[in-house]
Amino acid sequence: MTSVYHTPVLLEESVRLLDIDPAGTYVDLTFGGGGHSRRILSALGDRGRLYAFDQDRDTRDNCPEDSRFHYVESNFRFMRGALRLRGVTRVDGILADLGVSSHHFDAVERGFSFRGSAPLDMRMNQRGGGTAADLVNTLDADALTRILGDWGEIDTPWKVAACIVRARTAQPILTTADLVAAVAPCTPKKDESKFLTKLFQALRIEVNGEMEALKMALEQSLKVLRPGGRLVVISYHSLEDRLVKNFLRSGNFEGRIEKDFFGKPETPFEIITRKAVTPVSYTHLPSPRDKRQP
């Protein structure tokens, strides 16, 4: 199965910025095909440890046979609790490669791609939870409008929601092809791929609770990282980008800078740039796959 996973974007850059201590403890929040984990392991010594999270059971087949490696089959929103169960309270670095992997787009049967026809699933964790088909067939127009506007940043989400509601009254929307056909009346011909990318992104984020999971992981990172530890995040779209930047610059998701008694800004992280590396660090790396279409 490993062969169907592509080489991670910014592999060397992201691992280099972790500044790995060979005897340190590290977390890969998004194991996937294991590319980042294998690169981290190559920099660790015999005493080093790596904990890799993924809620998609398919990824278990990619686990390396290495006593320093510990696979955690869980959503990364439960990072702190899962680590504590394994006797880990502090780590030296955390890496997160956000969003959906190229494997999920390529595995058409999972329903992440609008190319072809497959069950409208979109669950990262296929063992439970509602599917994208459940959303589009049961939610009212107002709820669909919110999802499409908030998570897809679609210009006229109410029109798209109306198309979906109208189509499902004739027959259930069960496949990716059904959904593409349902929104055809409101799909701009000139920007069809861009529009469908936003539509599928919105539903995927809602199905998997991606933004809430990201918030929880970021908040927990403050309690899990040792002083001097590093958090490296690769993001793919503007929603993740804003959320991560706000939190790392201000310690909250609104971007509100708090000040101490003397008027000095209180920020939980210092930003890494290519010209300066600080003891407690964060780097935000925009990915070339920002514009990748499902």
Can you say where each PLM-predicted feature lies in the sequence?
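S-adenosyl-L-methionine-dependent methyltransferase catalytic core, i.e., the SAM/SAH-binding region
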Residues: 1-289
